[in-house]
Design a protein with these regions (language model features):
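Bulky hydrophobic segments
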Residues: 1-94, 98-122
Length: 122
């Protein structure tokens, strides 16, 4: 099962990297749709994308600290690389990426803690 998650994780990472690094002009989105996507919506999208990234890597690899570290570094590196595209660097993107990772981390921590408690009561 871990092998399956590794494949999905790397595929997701590639697609995410492409989506975050290609210029927005290359997306088939009209100017009207781009204007409708507010900064708040974009931040929520970043949060969800990195929530999923951490979740997938969590089930793919055993060293949880390295996964957390990778997601943090990846978030910063991708944002820095956006300086060289027409997208630009935004500190709030990094913040919401990291919030997504943190929420995913806390969600899994809570889930497994409750699962352990349920086993103890049986």
């Amino acid at each position: 099962m871990k092998q399956f998650f590794k494949i999905i994780s790397f595929f997701y990472l590639i697609v995410l990297s492409i989506a975050l690094l290609i210029p927005l002009d290359l997306f088939i989105i009209t100017q009207t749709v781009q204007e409708e996507i507010s900064d708040n919506t974009a931040f929520i999208i970043h949060l969800v994308l990195f929530f999923i990234l951490y979740l997938l890597f969590y089930f793919s690899f055993s060293n949880k600290f390295r996964i957390l570290l990778f997601c943090i570094i990846y978030s910063v590196v991708v944002e820095i690389l956006q300086i060289f595209t027409s997208r630009g660097f935004q500190i709030f993107d990094i913040i919401f990426n990291l919030i997504g990772v943190l929420i995913s981390f806390l969600f899994l921590l809570y889930f497994y803690k409750n699962k352990r408690k349920q086993r103890e009561f049986k």
